[in-house]
Design a protein with these regions (language model features):
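Charged, low-complexity, helix/coiled-coil-prone segments
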Residues: 1-10, 44-51, 100-106
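Generic preference for well-ordered secondary structure
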Residues: 9-10, 14, 18-20, 41-45, ...
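Short acidic-aromatic low-complexity motifs
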Residues: 2-35
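A beta-strand edge to alpha-helix "cap/lid" segment located at domain peripheries
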Residues: 5, 58-126
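A solvent-exposed, acidic/Ser-Thr-rich amphipathic alpha-helical stretch
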Residues: 23, 27-78, 82
Length: 126
């Protein structure tokens, strides 16, 4: 259950992912000029990847979800928020294995302007 504005935003973010509504997630939660820095090795060039703008984010997240498949969040911890930032760590499993991830979102006008992603595979397929 959401108890704070940041947690509500996070819960909505996961809901978009679980429903497969990546376009909705990007359009409603990321600024038009948003930047994602990702460690996931899913593009033709090695990571880290710097992805800019909604169109590129949509393409990246589609590849990312194809790579991961269904995601099962096992734990969420170190969740923190301020008026312009949200950060958290989580453990999840997917078809690529078990991951420890961390994300930091810098917010502008209630949307993600900068998304910093960190990840380490701790077991499984990847």
């Amino acid at each position: 259950m959401s108890t704070t504005p940041g947690r509500k935003f996070f819960d909505e973010h996961l809901d978009y992912i679980f429903k497969g509504d990546l376009d909705g997630m990007i359009d409603k939660q990321y600024t038009e000029d948003a930047v994602l820095i990702s460690p996931f090795d899913i593009l033709d060039t090695p990571p880290p990847h710097i992805v800019r703008g909604r169109a590129a984010l949509k393409a990246f997240f589609r590849k990312y979800m194809d790579y991961q498949g269904a995601i099962n969040v096992e734990s969420l911890y170190d969740f923190a928020e301020t008026e312009d930032a949200i950060s958290f760590q989580a453990v999840f499993t997917s078809k690529t294995g078990k991951w420890v991830v961390g994300d930091a979102w810098y917010m502008r006008d209630g949307m993600i302007a900068y998304h910093f992603s960190f990840a380490h595979n701790i077991g499984g397929a990847a």
